[in-house]
Amino acid sequence: MPIENLLEGLVYGRERIPEIIDFSGLDISSKVKMEILTHFDMTIEQAKQYRVQINSKYLSEIKNFKLDFSEPLRFYLMANDQTTVMQFVSKSIADTLKEKGCDVLFDLYRGTEDITCFKKIYEYKPHVTININHLNNRFLGNDVFNFVWFQDPMEHLVDSSDLYIRNRDYIFSLLPAFDMLLEKKSIPFQRQNFCIDSTKYKIDKTVKREKKIVFIGSAYHGEDLDRINVLEVIDYIMNLFQNGESFSNEKMDEIVKKFSKNKTFLETRVMSYIVRDLSVLWLCSIKSDYEVEVYGWGWDSYEAVRPYYKGVLKYGEEIAKVYNSAAFAFAPHFSYALQNRVLEATACGAIPIVYDRRGVSDEPVYDEAMYYFKTFEDLRNILMNNKIEEKDFSRLLEEHSYVRFVDKILDTIQKSLQNE
């Protein structure tokens, strides 16, 4: 912004207020630098004071919005471009709402914005806000509908704090592990599995499908798993995993008691690491007619994976192209079979091979759409079988569309308004 309008621009804008001036490459005297700094510091202090006042006004106005629900509904979705999944989920929901003719503001933060500035939401005056992993509800008025989809074990879910829930807050949970956390806080919720973005992930007939199996996703090993007191439980669980243990809820409770470990940590970190990383190592050790390709962060640290490691793919077109080129998509995960990667793969025509949680998980079963494995031999038998049966992805994709999720949101709003 022009230096002569610096104060006004900072006060009424929503960019983060700068902290320092960089004089690099400028041939100016120390005296001039000092004069600039003095003026800059005074301007910044004034801007901070005015910004607080204006934000307070925004918050007060937002809290007291009186909305007219007879007019077309306005939907507000905020996202951060530093997130790897959340921003794309929010964007897909926003795009689906737009396709249905809704008025939508998709507010993508790119790192320069002041996250405490509520200018856009004040100006837009939404009837509905939709958030991923965060409630973002304390500043909302009673009229606003707020939908929150928890897809990760956020700190405010795991800790013992109370969560502020309004009458028009509606919570969705991705996994049974998050169900448990919400139940502990006495928060009502609905189950919502991942959805598929069919605009990015679809059959591409220009890509030749080859006899190969691909894995796309990060390795789960981390420093938090290298502690001695964690290695003991890892060794114990790894032995059970290699012998085909089903890891029912009762079995997990038994392990929690035996090792005095937090159940959420065991399920979201230890089990996820063992099921994913060890399974990929199994895959790379099987000699079959299928070419193996592994993509994602962290796999180059495994010597056995390096010959098959192909780097990191960008979200969207690059991932879709790889899945369109593969016969199988390997997608082992402890908590759930219906991951984003499974949906993306099926939309692109690759048959998923997933870790078998049937019988111990309450998620839907799609035998007609995927292969299941629990042991090394299960995986080997799939890859060594010369007669691969065709799979039907239609039910899986239809039941996990963003259209269906958005319809659920719209139906919830309509029913709530009718019941008032």
Pin down the residues of each PLM region.
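Short, surface-exposed amphipathic charged segments that create phosphate/polyanion-binding patches used
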Residues: G9-G13, L163-R166, I203-K212, Y309, ...
